[in-house]
Amino acid sequence: MVRLLERYVKYFPVTSDTPIISIGEGNTPLVRLDNLGVKLGIELYGKCEGLNPTGSFKDRGMVLAVAKALEAGSKGII
């Protein structure tokens, strides 16, 4: 499985010194939202971010934050 940092490396401030880490975040499914889509007159989809490892959309952003903290030599993160 391609990890989030690897997949979006050209969009993130990732260098060769940035550790590529993952807790299995990302790759959440798109679900068609038929009822709301019909009301809005569009084809509408939503992401199931609750299926990330911690059940939160924050997993995506935190993997980059933790990788950059590790790159900077941080011993801990609060």
Which role does the model predict for each range below?
Residues 1-78:
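PLP-dependent amino-acid enzyme catalytic core
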